[in-house]
Structures are given as C-alpha cells and as structure tokens.
C-alpha cells in the first residue's frame, strides 16, 4: 500500500511540475532539483551573483543567478566520469553560428517558466540514473566547476562520490552490473544512425541533436531540410515499464551493414530507447500505423482504435460522389489486409534499431498518400452519412478486418448528396484456399504413408499438377478399383491444394461481381479507387506503391485530386 501511495504521489508531483512548472527564480530551481533527488546548495559569489550547484552520481550542474536582474547568467554541466565530452548545445544554432547554443542556459533564459528546463533536467537525471561509470571518484582537472568555485565544487563532488548507486537514484546496484555509459552512447548514437541512413536509406534522412533547446535526437528528411523544417520523429531515452529489462549498446557496423553489440557487458537495466513519430493528433486526424508492419513488442501506449474513425473504416463504403462541379462518382475498394492502430511511440531497443527506416518510410507514405486521400473522402461525407458510418462501426464487433467478409457490414449507407451503391461482397477479398479439414499434413504423416507403402509425390510433381478445389471433381480423374492408385491420385489433389494454401489469391467470384457492379451507375462506367495499407490505384492514373519512389507518391496524389476537383 505504501508503494502505491508513493507511486501516485510521484505522478501528482510530475503533473504539477509539467503543468505548473513555476517561474524562473533561484528558489524554484532549487526546489525543482530537490524534488528530483538531486543534492543542491547555494553559494553567494558576490553581492549580485548566487551560484546554485546541484549534482547526482555523475552530473554536476552550476547555475549562476543574478539577483539584481532576476535572471540566469550562466549554466555549466560537467560529468563525474572518464567521459566528459557530452554535448549540451543546440546543433542548429551552433551550425548557424549563434554563440548562445547552450540549451541548459537557453531553457532558463528564453522561456517564462521552468517547463523546458525541467524536461532537460529529467533527461540528464535519467542518463545519470541508468549509466555505469568506470570511476565514480575521478574528475579530471578540466572538469572544474569554474572560477571562484574550486572549494565548493570539490565539496559537492565528495558528497556525490559517497552516494551509492542504490541510494542515489533508487536503482539496485546488483541489478545494474552493466558497463554502459548512456551519456557517451547518446553522443555517439547520432553518428551511428546517420551512417545507417546514409548506407541503408540512400541518405534520405538525417539526425540533428537537441532541437528547440530540448535534449533528444531529431530525425528530418534530408531533401529540403532547413532550421524551419518539422522533424519526422525524435529519439530519446525513457524508463522501462519492466525494471529488469536490459538495454544493450548496439552500434551500426558498416562492415556488416547491420546493428551489432560488440560487448555483451555494455548494457544497462531499466531503460528504453524510444522512437516517437511527430504528429499532432486531433479528433478527426490521427496517425495510424499497420498493426502487422513491425513486431508488436515495439508498440508503446497503443490507444483505443475506436476513439476515432479509421482510414479503412471510411474506405469500406463503396461509392462516393466527389467534386461539386463535375459530380464525379468513383468506386472505393477497401483492400486493407491489416488493422490500423493509433500509435506514435515505438521501443527501438537493441537490434530493433534496424526498423527505424521502415517506420519513417511508413510515416512519409501515410502523410503523403493515405492521409490526404482519407481527409478528402471524409470531407465528402455528409453529417447524416457520418452518423450512419459511426453506427455501423459501433454495432459491429470485428469491423473491417481481413477475416470479416459479411456482406451486410460492407454495404454503404444512403446519401442524398452522394451516389452510393451497395456491394454484395468486399472487393478483392484475400482468402486462403482450404486444405482437407483446414489441417496441414505433418512430417510424421508423410513418414507413415511411406512405411505403409502408399504412393508419394515430389514437390515438382505436385507443383506441375493442375490446381483443383477440394469440393470440385476434375474431369480427367479416373477412379479405378485399385485402392492404391486411387489414394495416390487423391494425395496428388490434396498435395496441390496444400502447396497453394499459402498463396494469397484473388476471389474470382468477387472480381466478377465487381466487374458487373463497375458497369452500373449513371455513366455506365465508374472509375475504381483501390486503397490498401501499401498500395493505391485509380483507373486512368495507374498506381503508386509504398515501395515506389517518393516523387511518384506526390505526383499520383496530385493527379488524383485533379480528377476530384
């Protein structure tokens, strides 16, 4: 019960610090540091300047505060470890030649509250908590806390050195026996990811450190990049929900073309590396991600799918009239093969770093192709139809999944402003051919057949045979009185079905229905817009795929909207 009380109290304090961070005064900064468990004290350097020194196991921060002007004058960060090359500058400002690139100083001078500084302090404390240092009691002479602070710096350092890992940050030293310094790894991770993008993605993306005076690695598209560009995603560390979870040091190797762990002792416990897609969710405009695109253990904070209408929900309805001037009617075909989930954060620990490019490419595909088409379709739906759609979703348990082929579910509602036509079946349904009793033969069954002297067939013979459905009898099948011959021929039929069992086939019956439907309507020939999670096609414009060049995506959407306008 006490643990639950402390946990809830910690959450409340976190909310207060986030939503009511307080004004920037030396007293509030001191209280903020103390609330996080950092040792802090204030020294009076002269009549005007007070120096707040705060420290934990590794970090030592000096903040010089001008009491007369009520402003922060300088902030310095040093690390009590052998690695003291941690970058706390705004890379974009540094590249632009701005001398004020110190993000700790900027977060205390460029804002009205402590919110930005609180974020940066939490990030540093997180790295401090889960980092291992080779020597806690070594601070190089270059790591002095500045002029006029030699005595104070050494006393604070001595206090920090006496703190054990368990007492300093709540992490059991027996659990974290790894040798990973997260400060060093975070500094080098930018270089590794940029090399990965250069060699695996044709330099399509680039990583910039510490944007908008916040710690983190921000990922941009290389083409058209500028300081005003909006990042696609950001990479940062976060406490793991499973305290015993290990985080290993994975680096990108140009020799192998993959992410590798060179030393199994370089790990930390209780921390995750997060990739967060930069997307401003609203009630009707959210970021959707295909559920089966990456392993589900990467998903963090998956939201309720039914809170908003999905892309595939809208596309399930057959016909819409788009464009008030031309009254263009098109047929929409839903060919989605997976559910879309509302999620923006992914756990890219360890070898999952290899999936960064796939997630980013999907993000661009969604923003460039699926999202504009989705918003265009939503804008064409009247309020009455919107209520019908939401009612259909609410009354159906397994709506719009690959397995659901209920014709009633796929029917579109009546629209007084748009042309709707009901479909008898879902267009281009993907299904698997059934094997005998929906059961695949095992290896042991093949051995039994051989022992009993039953006829066997090679893979080549099976592939060469004409495919037949289980419920159809081929015309050329001669059933003789010879049971062995009959069994062998029957095996040939079943074997052929087994081989084709994994093939994703187009339902020919559904296609025939679609062809007949497409010829109906006022004009007698209604163009078809087919959309799934990685492919879009439209009659007369061709198609574009997730695997095509990005320029083709934009050109296809532009041409498609010209048809709608």
Swiss-Prot record:
Q: Could you state a single Gene Ontology molecular function term?
A: transcription coregulator activity
User: Which Pfam families does the annotation name?
Assistant: Med1 (PF10744)
For this chain, the annotated S-S bridges are none
* Region called Disordered, residue ranges: 141-170
Question: Keywords for this entry?
Answer: Activator, Nucleus, Transcription, Transcription regulation
Q: Which family does it belong to?
A: Belongs to the Mediator complex subunit 1 family.
Q: How does it assemble?
A: Component of the Mediator complex.
- Protein known as: Mediator of RNA polymerase II transcription subunit 1
What gene name is given for the protein in this entry?
A: MED1
